Amino acid sequence: MHSDELLVEILVEELPAQALLNEYKEMPKKLHALFNKRALEVGKIEIFYTPRRLCLLVKDFPLLTQETKEEFFGPPVKIACNHQDKTQGLNELGLGFYQKLGLKDHQHFQTAFKNNNEVLYHAKIHAKEPTKDLIMPIVLEFLEGLNFGKSMRWGNVEKSFIRPIHNICVLFNGENFNDIEVKEYGFKTKQATKAHRQEGFDFIQVDSPKAYFEVLEKNHVILDPKKRKAKILQEIKELETKHRIIVEIDRDLLDEVVAITEYPSALLGEFDKAFLKLPNEIIITSMKENQRYFAAFNQKSQESPTLHNGFIVVSNAISKDKQKIIAGNQKVLKARLSDAVFFYENDLKKPLDNAPLESVVFVQGLGTLKDKMEREAIIAQYLTQKYASSLNMPLEKALELVGRAVRIAKADLLSEVVYEFSELQGIMGYYYALKQNENELVALSVKEQYLPASENAPLPSSVFSAIVALSLKLDSLFSLFSVGKIPSGSKDPFALRRLSFGLLKIVVHYGLEFDLKADLKNLFEKVGVYQSFDLEVLEKFLLERFNNLIDCNPSIIRSVLNTNERGIVKIIQKVKALKRFLDDPKNAQKKELLFSAFKRLANINKDRNPNESSEFFISLFKESQEHALFEAFNAIKTSTFESLDSKIEAYFGLHAPLEEYFKSVLVMDKDIEIQKNRKNFLWGVYQSFLEIGDIKEIAI
């Protein structure tokens, strides 16, 4: 037998769920790296976790290391020997090389060639060694390499970790790993594990991976998080069927309860129906954030199920008295929801107009929330006038309602409910607005101002809401860029990348053309209070988001962005049209020929000043191919196309006259006047192509 199964359990105090979940994804990669570092070829690696333990299971862990050769290259022979022919032995430099390696016999030194130089050389062969001596150092290095964000020290231990470590159990090939002193964390190892807390606190001896799994199973520990998740979902499904409810499975919450349980049980509790007068979002958020409960809905109405006065709690207890567990959770939730009622009713007493926005700083150097609201109002007015035809209401009415929406949009940030649950910003503003008899469009736009919340999240439901959402996003971009709060690398504290992506998605979804040069400049000047900064930096930042906006060959996107087109909607339309054309198999030959011809066209003009005159004269054309290309080109220039697709088809149709032109016409004619005329003509053709895209950028 050359290998065996290796199991390592790190027994700890309860690990914080979110930190564990974040780092768990990186653990297999980090363990692999440690094995590779020592040239250990192993089989499948599995890492399991519960709140109290990390378990590393490695299949086919070798019993012996591989024989390895370590090479050492010294100074060049010509300066390390007493004579260049090497017959006179080593000088002081050469002797020093071997002495550093701990070698005394230099009589028969070796040489090798490195970078075309003959140098002193020594190879050290490392014989195979038992891997059992490597296991603990690997485990300790693994623990030290984990990044949970925060760590702590306990007792007089040398190292810190996210929570105190109580034991490391190593099971491998029947070897003895008991009583190994781990000074770093202040304990001696035991080949033992512990049961579920309610089963006892004593160590249970184990002597093999098989015995380890059997002990945990008998003692109410489900080690595999996938199995714990499956158990929870199965029990929730049974409760849904039994009680005719629909449980909203929040995937993040599910992962969290899996991470805080060793033997989960899903139980159904209830709360007083009187609490259902609260907005659903308050109840659901309170249950999720404070208690990690899942919300339940009535099954009667499939289209729009109503919130049920029940909740799912996932318990880690193994008590048979489930009702006692349920009663305890119901008592806690009652207190939480009573607080929520108090906050909500207090908020309803405060008019939205009276919210003291001037008392809250937006960002240092950018004024208060009132200042932000006033800037957004100017932007919203500009956008309302720009998109008036898409609003289905008179402009005067639209300006009034949009202005009102922006005026009250930030009021809920000062409410007691949002102070308690910040993720309800906008949502609570919607409910408060309706309760205070605001227009429904206004109220809904307050709710939707922060949308989309993520890449695939819903967008604002109307152009009206879109204008309010765009105003918020544009002001945040202008403001933060003006004071240098520009994302760099992985740092994006104000989530401006997500915000920008949302801006683009809204504009494209509703076809609200927005020019990243002209409109940005107009708004910057119209608001008039932003600190001066280079608007091209913001323009470039927004353009960089296009690669995530559409599933497409990035070079096609780049070809359109490399032109003067800065209308967001037009950019996307051109990218999609080019993609359709290039993806069509019947255009394969045509595009290959045009790419070849266009690259020649681009090369001829690569050093040209864009502002240089491109005037040319047909009277100076000497070859029939010049006239043929001009006629084909002129036909396109003077045509009106029904669609971008037909325009692209026409431009790509120039591949034939372009190919003939380059076969028969010498652009760099000896006659300077003719040469200049030809270059000017081709420059005009090249510039015209930029109406659809810079074809030289496309890589298919």
Swiss-Prot record:
One of its GO terms (biological process) is glycyl-tRNA aminoacylation. It is found in: Cytoplasm. One of its GO terms (molecular function) is glycine-tRNA ligase activity. Keywords: Aminoacyl-tRNA synthetase, ATP-binding, Cytoplasm, Ligase, Nucleotide-binding, Protein biosynthesis. It comes from the Bacteria. InterPro entries: Gly-tRNA-synth_bsu, Gly-tRNA-synth_heterodimer. It catalyses: tRNA(Gly) + glycine + ATP = glycyl-tRNA(Gly) + AMP + diphosphate. It is an enzyme of class 6 (ligase). Its EC number is 6.1.1.14. PROSITE patterns: AA_TRNA_LIGASE_II_GLYAB. One of its GO terms (cellular component) is cytosol. Its main location: cytoplasm. Belongs to the class-II aminoacyl-tRNA synthetase family. Tetramer of two alpha and two beta subunits. This is Glycine--tRNA ligase beta subunit.
